[in-house]
Regions:
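Conserved switch/coupling elements of ABC/ABC-like ATPase nucleotide-binding domains
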Residues: 216-222
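ABC family nucleotide-binding domain
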Residues: 3-214
């Protein structure tokens, strides 16, 4: 069953005669529970595509459907709520709140919604990621790999429809990168969690269930 679909997605910048096509007719489908890597060189359009998938930017034409919701039909306010509730993000630079503890960072999106967190589920995530003894720590007391584990836990905590990971190993050494990718694979399987990961690294991409290659704003392989 597909959880994510794009249809003829286009994104242009600028005006004639200097229009730049960042995305040009991108159509992809991702099934529930799939771990997909989108790979491309710098300037290929992969980051622009991630922004479209996550509702962080709107396409010039075409549409994105997540969990049967067409993002283009949501106004800005509803899109913000949908993004918070149904899409988890993992960024290269972790994006943790420095004044909040590890635990507070993990439950932060749920707290923003005024909802009660599923503590049993979250503790299962915490144990899987090896964060049990770090819950009271502030982010600046953690290594880069530990901070990325917190970011993964935060993305999983709200049980999103999809998780979007933007170069999640970009700031990590090779050993820690391997550990983070392995954790993404394990969490995808254990929680049947859909993950779409952006990367420029072929070795990292090949560890996903499937690889989609983007070149010059178009899908070259999927």
């Amino acid at each position: 069953m597909s959880i994510l679909q794009t249809t003829n997605l286009c994104k242009t910048y600028g005006q004639k005669p200097n229009i730049v096509k960042a995305l040009d007719g991108v159509t992809i489908t991702v099934d529930k529970g799939e771990f997909v890597a989108i790979i491309g060189t710098s300037g290929s359009g992969k980051s622009t595509l991630l922004h479209m998938l996550g509702g962080l930017d709107r396409p010039t034409s075409g549409n994105v459907k997540v969990d049967n919701f067409e993002l283009g039909k949501l106004n800005d306010e509803n899109l913000t709520v949908f993004r918070r509730q149904r899409i988890g993000f993992i960024f290269q630079n972790y994006n943790l709140v420095p004044v909040l503890s590890v635990w507070e960072n993990i439950i932060f999106p749920i707290t923003l919604d005024g909802k009660t967190s599923d503590q049993q589920f979250i503790m299962e995530i915490v144990k899987l990621l090896g964060l049990e003894k770090k819950l009271d720590n502030l982010p600046n007391n953690l290594s880069g790999g530990q901070q990325q584990r917190v970011a993964i836990a935060r993305a999983l905590a709200s049980k999103p429809a999809i998780i979007l990971a933007d170069e999640p190993t970009g700031n990590l050494d090779s050993k820690t990168s391997d550990e983070v990718i392995e954790l993404l694979k394990v969490t995808s399987k254990k929680f049947h969690q859909t993950i779409v990961m952006i990367t420029h690294n072929p070795e990292i991409a090949e560890q996903a269930d499937r690889t989609i290659r983007i070149e010059d704003g178009r899908i070259a392989q999927q």
